[in-house]
Amino acid sequence: MTGFVYRYLAEDHRRLEQLLDLATRDPCRIDASAFLEFRSGLLRHISMEEKILLPAARAAHGDKPLPLAAALRLDHGALAALLVLTPTTTTIKAIRTILEAHNPKEEGPEGIYSQCENLPGFNSGVILERLRNAQAVAMNDYIDSPIAVASARNAVVRAGYDSGMLNGL
């Protein structure tokens, strides 16, 4: 059985997937407006997990992080680093690859969302309200400098993914 927090965050995953699909519907061009909405939404989603969900889980778990938290944080770092770069077919493919591996870590039967909601002391109602009220993340313009590309590549590798997925950048 899934709880309120699980459903809220999983539904947000579906919304983000739809936005990314919309942004890439035309194989010849990326819909900049749809991608910008995806970018903003994914950064907000990551922020909700990093600033609300994972700290609440840690507090409910005797001030110890859940075992999956470290891997999720590495994935979040890789995704955020990729969102710094101007979207291209290469960066979008990398984002999709990471999300395809990442989302089951959160939504799966043993995923972090279920783990959180099963913790004694994890108040789903309070956490859900905080998630709903989470603010958008401020975004800067895209940066495609060699340092930004290297940072994205390093974040992807730290998270355990193949840096070759960024070949051509």
Feature annotation, model-predicted:
Residues 1-169:
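Small-residue-biased structural context
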